[in-house]
């Protein structure tokens, strides 16, 4: 009789001797449908900052313990301490954090010229990382014919220039040399990672080329942030009669909202819709960012305390190629969602909501082009039943 995977003893820690790291091989984090948690995760009622008291899932424990060990071993470019954090006064609720080291120490972005640029094995890629940087391999346990087969390995790798605690990358089939273009398989694992976590602030995201992805090798970002974000409960309006796609309202960056109540057939529908939308944008050289978080159902009024499903927000934006050093922060997946990692103490102390909004809106598409994209994505969703 097989031992249930939640009872199996697997170590995600490295052996003491670095020479043994490569010999150990990559451990598997095996999970099944029963590990995916839908509606039970909430921010603590009295104070969201008390989130460290919430119970951890098996996934959280594996990721956090392995990540902490790599931090102690000095495998990161800097030692991440508790980040100074402030909620900017105003109606949006921006969460600003001072992260000086990331601004200084992070790897220099690659020379990107196109949203559809091919993978270049000569450039830095995730086949060139040290063995100790890989935490584990995500391994979906099939349960019957209805469960999608996981076709490729998805590695969980530390981001050596972390934004926040537990910042890792999901890297699918690294040996295949996939360019930074979203694919259904890795999006599925990203969504399932959110459902595997009991932490309401575990987020997943994707930057396209031209959307400030710094490495042209397919990867998603995952990290913990112990604060609610504006996108979790922002109101929305449906863009099509069936409610396949919504437009987020009352935020500096209106985004396309896709929603699912949790694991099950609807998750596969959402994955298909999102990837058709990102394919459309990539094919037309339109840069984009994507953010996945627990959040409220679509509708005119919502609350950040309602985390009854999964929100996937997609932003089409102006392409940004090359290194951008101006401004208090660079605008990518977390900034569009309301999390602002600020690069200098001076900018952190002087940053206002109005200045943050101006920086973000400067990266958005002109209204005419934004309207064309909106109409095209609505038409794309309408083809679902044709």
Curated annotation (Swiss-Prot):
Highly expressed in the nervous and male reproductive systems compared to kidney, liver and heart. The active site is at residue 219. One of its GO terms (cellular component) is cytoplasm. One of its GO terms (molecular function) is guanyl-nucleotide exchange factor activity. InterPro entries: GDPGP. PANTHER family: GDP-D-GLUCOSE PHOSPHORYLASE 1 (PTHR20884:SF8). Specific and highly efficient GDP-D-glucose phosphorylase regulating the levels of GDP-D-glucose in cells. Belongs to the GDPGP1 family. The orthologs in A.thaliana are GDP-L-galactose phosphorylases catalyzing the first reaction of the Smirnoff-Wheeler pathway, the major route to ascorbate biosynthesis in plants. This is GDP-D-glucose phosphorylase 1. It comes from Mus musculus (Mouse).
